[in-house]
Swiss-Prot record:
One GO BP: anterior/posterior pattern specification
High-level lineage: Eukaryota, Metazoa, Chordata, Craniata, Vertebrata
GO MF terms held by the record: armadillo repeat domain binding; beta-catenin binding; transcription coactivator binding; transcription regulator inhibitor activity
UniProt entry tagged with the keyword Cell inner membrane: no
SUPFAM superfamilies xref list: beta-catenin-interacting protein ICAT (SSF81730)
Organism, scientific name: Homo sapiens (Human)
Role description: Prevents the interaction between CTNNB1 and TCF family members, and acts as a negative regulator of the Wnt signaling pathway.
Protein name per its UniProtKB record: Beta-catenin-interacting protein 1
Length: 81
């Protein structure tokens, strides 16, 4: 996760955004989230909705590492634009 931050966002906002993205990727890959993780996503439903469209598509054959790497690449490309 990028700890340098983004302009206009507090470290807490960045943490929430990153955690939402990771949990959504895990859910999309078929992982069962814990009750506290599901509650976190419900609590930050607005962030969840904005992040869903940003998740990279993945094949069921792709491993978790490949999906995370693809997501990291897309994040890097977004920041360069």
């Amino acid at each position: 996760m990028n700890r340098e931050g983004a302009p206009g966002k507090s470290p807490e906002e960045m943490y929430i955004q990153q955690k939402v993205r990771v949990l959504l990727m895990l859910r999309k890959m078929g992982s069962n989230l814990t009750a506290s993780e599901e509650e976190f996503l419900r609590t930050y439903a607005g962030v969840v909705n904005s992040q869903l469209s940003q998740l990279p598509p993945h094949s069921i054959d792709q491993g978790a590492e490949d999906v995370v790497m693809a997501f990291s690449r897309s994040e890097t490309e977004d920041r360069r634009q």
